């Protein structure tokens, strides 16, 4: 009996654990502190800094089952998903890694043992082929002489992409970064399937399928193309779980493995589809995986960056559901079946199931409002098309008006063998894209700008003043030996009490001083393992090697500590009041206030806000001890400590406990007891995106200042109303009721005045061919009263044409009324449009009533004078 996908995943991890590897949990799909990546797309992403020598772990061997998304590239990447056997937006990458431990020999032998060992995957050895980089004789010899693969099944692959190291068997992360030769393992499905071995003209067939890539990471590629040896040669491997599952389950398509069979059946059930071979079922089954896990990792549908990629995938799935005949929202209903088929890999998703379902449902409901109209417009445009290409302007209109991502439009067009002018679409999108780039969350890559050898020891939990030594200085990202008065710089110390910005808490400010110099620190940031003090030399000069006294701004740090501790209390309170679906999505803690973004489906009710505020203040009054402990990450999670989904943690973590109320992983600075916070006050609650709410709050002195300001305001209002704060509500209600009554009386007076004005105007009408014509500019009449006056005049005059105008705040308001027996000759919309054009405006409406506006009041008399001639010509 073949293994299930979940069993294959576990067997891989168990095998490498037996070989001394640390089993490391999958990292978030949103790369942590790596602006070069849109999504996590390989198992090695979370170890990038380890390979570069910028980070250290307490293990030298690791194994993972990493969730990956590849959907941010060209549009046809997404279009292929569901239509080929192996294209996916979401997949799991099984990997084993060596950080300067074992190298080629063990990496190759481990792979062979797992694939062919009787107790493991037990694949027939004669079915396996391997490739090596053309000049990698060492790997070739290991395969041939030590493993025993016949030489005719070992293929050397050279630089086949037109440049040095541009080879299928030379792996590189990008234009820069870790790289090296690799060896790949292929499975031969047999001669009943078309295709040839790698390197042959028929290599693109489906007979020989790559199942494992083993990278021998030896170099760090620089921007100028040079290859710098890495500190220690390392190994990075990747094997697609879905691909190896297809091999072990004896099927040729990834969509035929157990996981996808079950998902496809669920898709058919919620959409009402009966043909299980329909490609749309594959599309939706793939897309629910990427969409659900992206939302769980904090990505929200939007029109920018990661959020736009997510929106594209969701809307493509919805459109395929529409093609299958789905009559109601269906996509969100697939989250539960997905959790079931993912096994242990779905545990984190299950924790956020309600939030993920709500976000997907909201997006589906929003798109459903425009999907049918957009498809109708596209169908109309395609039916009129003369050639085989839809113009970019129409594609952009579908995007801008109906929310159609261009790849969804291309999907529809492809079914009719029509292309989309994507260059034209991109041209129309350029302004939006420019704005998106400017507002992008991808900031500067500080580690790329400043490379610091060595580390700084942070001692700021216990000290706010400390002696240290300058180990490096930087100006504009470049290392220097010294800095002088007036220069802005980054100062690296061997040890420091300054907290570097992390986990939402801002960096410390303060002063570095020594013999003959003073350096004002305006911010503190991390640079790899080092801590950088950013600021300006206030006096004197300092150089590398100087002794310094580092003084943190104590009062500012104290306020930050209170706000950070209050954030933890509020997080726990939100989960109690709103539900356990609440998860932190972002935070900002500074010395003035705190801001907390969290997952929730709707605006909080006033009573919920009050309940959270009361609960936090209750914990403050309990004066709970705030304790920290350092422990293994697994032990911390087992103790119930909340970890931020997607946050990057070391193997040893700091657990912050506030009595029995809150336990979280946190590296920030905190109060000693909850009572130190003094008082907690929520100042606002708002939405930042679909499914994400934001609370802003203040503590301590800041909260007292808010209360004092509110009290002063109430006293001022009480004095104005000649009352006191005790009966203020009653006084305000009475004043509002009196105001409403006066407004009602005023409106009645205005209507009476308008009726009288209409009666006066009716005598000024002149007759043209049996039709009364009245044209007049009125003064002191509100624009909204003109319609009432026109109706009155039409009733009084019978067959009539009325044009009234007034000017308020320099703007012209026009209205035209035509009795129904005259509308066959004179249309009110045409008439008012003719007048509006002369006063710099436009308008329109029904044949019997139309209105318009204009900006040129000086042209109004002449415009009104032209009405008689225009009407006479029509009558």
Swiss-Prot record:
Its main location: cytoplasm. GO terms for biological process: alanyl-tRNA aminoacylation; negative regulation of DNA-templated transcription. Its cofactor is Zn(2+). Keywords: Aminoacyl-tRNA synthetase, ATP-binding, Cytoplasm, Ligase, Metal-binding, Nucleotide-binding, Protein biosynthesis, RNA-binding, tRNA-binding, Zinc. It is found in: Cytoplasm. Homotetramer. Catalyzes the attachment of alanine to tRNA(Ala) in a two-step reaction: alanine is first activated by ATP to form Ala-AMP and then transferred to the acceptor end of tRNA(Ala). Also edits incorrectly charged Ser-tRNA(Ala) and Gly-tRNA(Ala) via its editing domain. HAMAP family: Ala_tRNA_synth_B. Consists of three domains; the N-terminal catalytic domain, the editing domain and the C-terminal C-Ala domain. The editing domain removes incorrectly charged amino acids, while the C-Ala domain, along with tRNA(Ala), serves as a bridge to cooperatively bring together the editing and aminoacylation centers thus stimulating deacylation of misacylated tRNAs. This is Alanine--tRNA ligase. It comes from Klebsiella pneumoniae subsp. pneumoniae (strain ATCC 700721 / MGH 78578).
């Amino acid at each position: 009996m073949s293994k299930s996908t979940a069993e294959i995943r576990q067997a891989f991890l168990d095998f490498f654990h037996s070989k001394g590897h640390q089993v490391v949990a999958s990292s978030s799909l949103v790369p942590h502190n790596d602006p070069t990546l849109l999504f996590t797309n390989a198992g090695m992403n979370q170890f990038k800094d380890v390979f570069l020598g910028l980070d250290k772990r307490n293990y030298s061997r690791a194994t993972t089952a990493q969730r990956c998304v590849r959907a941010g590239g060209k549009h046809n990447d997404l279009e292929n998903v569901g239509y080929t056997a192996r294209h996916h937006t979401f997949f799991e990458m099984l990997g084993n890694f060596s950080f300067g431990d074992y190298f080629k020999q063990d990496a190759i032998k481990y792979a062979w043992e797992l694939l062919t060992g009787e107790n493991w995957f037990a694949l027939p050895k004669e079915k396996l082929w391997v490739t090596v980089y053309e000049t990698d004789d060492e790997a070739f010899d290991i395969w041939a002489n030590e493993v025993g693969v016949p030489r005719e099944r070992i293929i050397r692959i050279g630089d086949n992409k037109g440049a040095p190291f541009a080879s299928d068997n030379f792996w590189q992360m990008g234009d820069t970064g870790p790289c090296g030769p690799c060896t790949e393992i292929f499975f031969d499905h047999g001669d009943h399937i078309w295709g040839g071995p790698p390197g042959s003209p028929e290599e693109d067939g489906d007979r020989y399928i790559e199942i494992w890539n083993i990278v021998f990471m030896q170099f760090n590629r620089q921007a100028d193309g040079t290859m710098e040896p890495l500190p220690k040669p390392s190994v990075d491997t990747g094997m697609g779980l879905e691909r190896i599952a297809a091999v072990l389950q004896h099927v040729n398509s990834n969509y035929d493995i157990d996981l996808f069979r079950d998902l496809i059946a669920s898709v058919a059930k919620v959409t009402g589809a009966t043909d299980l071979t329909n490609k749309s079922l594959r599309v939706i089954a793939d897309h629910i995986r990427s969409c659900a896990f992206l939302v769980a990792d904090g990505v929200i549908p939007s029109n920018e960056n990661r959020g736009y990629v997510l929106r594209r995938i969701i809307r493509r799935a919805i459109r395929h559901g529409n093609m299958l005949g789905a009559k109601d929202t269906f996509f969100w209903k697939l989250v539960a079946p997905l959790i079931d088929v993912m096994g242990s890999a779905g545990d984190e998703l299950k924790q956020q199931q309600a939030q993920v379902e709500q976000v997907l449902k909201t997006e589906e409901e929003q798109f459903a409002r425009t999907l049918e109209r957009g498809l109708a417009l596209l169908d109309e445009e395609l039916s009129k098309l003369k050639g085989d290409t839809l113009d970019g302007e129409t594609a952009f209109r579908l995007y801008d008006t109906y929310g159609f991502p261009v790849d969804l439009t291309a999907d529809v067009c492809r079914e009719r063998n029509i292309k989309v002018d994507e260059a034209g679409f991109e041209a129309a999108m350029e302004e939006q894209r420019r704005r998106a780039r400017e507002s992008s969350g991808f900031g500067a890559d500080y580690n790329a700008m400043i490379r610091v050898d060595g580390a700084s020891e942070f001692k700021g939990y216990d000290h706010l003043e400390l002696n240290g030594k300058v180990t490096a200085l930087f100006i504009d990202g470049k290392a220097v030996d010294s800095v002088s008065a007036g220069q802005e710089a980054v100062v690296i110390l061997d040890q420091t009490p300054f907290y570097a910005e992390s986990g939402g808490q801002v960096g410390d400010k303060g002063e570095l001083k020594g013999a003959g110099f003073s350096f004002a620190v305006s911010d503190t940031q991390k640079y790899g393992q080092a801590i950088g003090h950013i600021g300006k030399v206030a006096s004197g000069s300092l150089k590398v090697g100087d002794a310094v006294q580092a003084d943190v701004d104590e009062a500012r740090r104290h306020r930050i500590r209170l706000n950070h501790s209050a954030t933890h209390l509020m997080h726990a309170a939100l989960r109690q009041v709103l539900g356990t679906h609440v998860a932190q999505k972002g935070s900002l803690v500074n010395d003035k206030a705190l801001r907390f973004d969290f997952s929730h489906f709707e605006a909080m009710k006033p009573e919920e806000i009050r309940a959270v505020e009361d609960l936090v203040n209750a914990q403050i009054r309990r004066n709970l001890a705030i304790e920290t402990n350092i422990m293994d990450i697994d032990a911390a999670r087992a103790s119930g400590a909340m970890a931020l989904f997607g946050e990057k943690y070391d193997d040893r973590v700091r657990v912050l406990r506030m009595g029995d109320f809150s336990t979280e992983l946190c590296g920030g600075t905190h109060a000693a007891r909850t009572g130190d916070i003094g008082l907690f006050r929520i100042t606002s609650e708002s939405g930042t995106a679909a499914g994400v709410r934001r609370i802003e709050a203040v503590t301590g002195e800041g909260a007292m200042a808010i209360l004092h300001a509110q009290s002063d305001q109430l006293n001022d209002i009480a004095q104005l109303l000649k009352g006191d704060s005790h009966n203020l509500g009653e006084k305000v209600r009475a004043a509002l009721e009196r105001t409403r009554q006066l407004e009602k009386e005023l409106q009645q007076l205005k209507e009476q005045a308008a009726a009288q004005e209409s009666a006066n105007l009716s005598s000024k009408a002149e007759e043209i061919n049996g039709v009364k014509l009245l044209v007049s500019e009125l003064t002191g009449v509100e624009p909204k009263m003109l319609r009432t006056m026109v109706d009155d005049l039409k009733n009084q005059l019978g067959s009539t044409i009325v044009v009234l105008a007034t000017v308020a705040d320099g703007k012209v308001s026009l209205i035209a009324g035509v009795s129904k027996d005259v509308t066959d000759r004179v249309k009110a919309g045409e008439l008012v449009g003719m007048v509006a054009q002369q006063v710099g405006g436009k308008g329109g409406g029904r044949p019997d009533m139309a209105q318009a506006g204009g900006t040129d009041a000086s042209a109004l008399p002449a415009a009104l004078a032209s009405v008689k001639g225009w009407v006479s010509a029509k009558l």
